[in-house]
């Protein structure tokens, strides 16, 4: 999920790859949305696109730290309604930002961004938390464009996955704050959980996500209503921030910026109440298992999964389920790493593992290089007719959608 505010990288970490350029992309279709994007590293490098978390958290330049600037062309973008994309879900009336804002719209934005930036061949797709959900959904939709999937803190966006973090013992809380009706993050962070549950009216605690959606259902009309809205949004984002790291005092997570909190919480809750817009029955279908139901679409993609053993935002069982499903589907190129860490990508072992993966990936041959390579081989072949048969359009074009 990752709706907690981004945190600066530790001072002893290498600087991010050099910034190249940024811009806004007019979203495809008849839409008001303009998608903000940035590039880092080398324009001649292997393209990698980063899917940020949340949904609604926005991108952060620190995400580029995992990539060798001589090797990679790193693309970050802010998903609809958040970060520097417009319109913003932080506005009092968030309706424009939340209109035409679904997972399918985000997938279409990635395709449009590829066109805008002239990424014509395959690319690496990198995502953590909700970013892993979007990365998987994109790869299911467009497997021919994906060279490698690199996933951290896997979130499958099933109802049980959401309830693990957001429901807990909320329904029983008023009668017994220490009730344990189901597994959940609340068991490990009781103080932070209490702060979160306290902002939800008791009558709405039977379904916390539904209660949050109710709180965000209309623009505030008075200062009091806006103050209440900010309080709920801040509690929602702070709860995730408190639970995101293994070695963080659950009481040490400060209050998020109001604009950030409104953006992140509104978009997050809209997606969660709609099952991440992944259900077969459309908006409102929270009981879906979309990713695992379509896992066969990913059987030919090399996939690296990194998950903290003590992740209490997205429990380890989600990564276990994904890896098992991939292997059962016949994907023999799955690498699975369990780190001594929580949810955050900034935890040292997780950070190191992600850097190592990116440094050790086999070099990717661009479509242009493949064409040049095939041309050289054709010129040196003893039998030109055989060479044409071996390196014809079908082979060269296999990396293109």
What residues fall within each predicted segment?
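N-terminal cap/lid segment of alpha/beta-hydrolase-fold proteins
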Residues: 10-34, 268
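Conserved HGGG/HGGXW glycine-rich cap/lid loop of the alpha/beta-hydrolase fold
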Residues: 28-91
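Conserved hydrolase catalytic core segment
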Residues: 121-160
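Short beta-strand/loop motif that positions the catalytic acidic residue
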Residues: 298-299, 305-307, 311
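Conserved alpha/beta-hydrolase "acid-adjacent" motif
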Residues: 312-318
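Catalytic active-site module of serine/aspartate enzymes centered on a nucleophile-bearing elbow/loop
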Residues: 329, 333-401
């Amino acid at each position: 999920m990752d709706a907690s505010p981004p945190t600066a990288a530790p001072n002893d970490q290498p600087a991010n790859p050099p910034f190249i350029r940024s811009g806004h992309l007019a979203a495809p279709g008849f839409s008001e949305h303009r998608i903000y994007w940035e590039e880092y590293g080398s324009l001649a490098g292997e393209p990698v696109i980063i899917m940020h978390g949340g949904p609604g958290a926005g991108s952060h330049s620190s995400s580029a730290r995992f990539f060798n600037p001589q090797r990679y062309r790193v693309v970050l973008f802010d998903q609809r309604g958040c970060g520097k994309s417009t319109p913003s879900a932080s506005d009092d009336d968030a309706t424009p930002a939340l209109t035409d804002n679904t997972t399918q719209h985000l997938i279409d934005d990635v395709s449009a961004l590829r066109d805008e930036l002239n990424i014509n061949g395959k690319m690496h797709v990198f995502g953590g938390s909700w970013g892993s959900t979007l990365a998987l959904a994109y790869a299911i939709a467009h497997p021919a464009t994906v060279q490698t999937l690199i996933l951290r803190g896997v979130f499958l966006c099933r109802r049980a996955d959401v309830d693990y973090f957001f429901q807990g013992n909320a329904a029983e809380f008023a009668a017994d704050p220490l009730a344990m009706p189901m597994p959940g993050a609340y068991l490990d962070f009781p103080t932070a959980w209490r702060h979160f549950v306290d902002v939800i009216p008791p009558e709405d605690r039977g379904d916390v996500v539904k209660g949050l959606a109710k709180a965000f259902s209309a623009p505030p009309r008075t200062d009091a209503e806006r103050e209440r809205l900010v309080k709920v949004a801040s509690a929602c984002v702070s709860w995730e921030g408190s639970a995101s790291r293994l070695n963080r005092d659950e009481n040490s997570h400060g209050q998020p910026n109001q604009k950030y909190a409104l953006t992140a919480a509104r978009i997050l809750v809209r997606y969660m109440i709609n099952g991440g817009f992944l259900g077969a029955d459309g908006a409102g279908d929270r009981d879906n298992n979309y990713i695992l139901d379509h896992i066969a679409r990913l059987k030919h993609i090399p996939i690296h999964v990194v998950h903290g053993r003590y992740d209490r935002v997205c429990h380890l069982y989600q990564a276990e389920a994904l890896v098992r499903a991939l292997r059962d589907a016949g994907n023999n190129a799955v690498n699975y790493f369990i780190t001594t860490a929580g949810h955050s990508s900034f935890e040292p072992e997780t950070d190191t593992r992600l850097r190592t993966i990116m440094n050790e990936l086999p070099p990717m041959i661009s479509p242009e290089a493949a064409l040049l390579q095939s041309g050289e081989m054709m010129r040196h072949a003893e039998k030109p007719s055989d060479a044409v048969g071996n390196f014809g359009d079908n082979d060269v074009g296999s990396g293109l959608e």
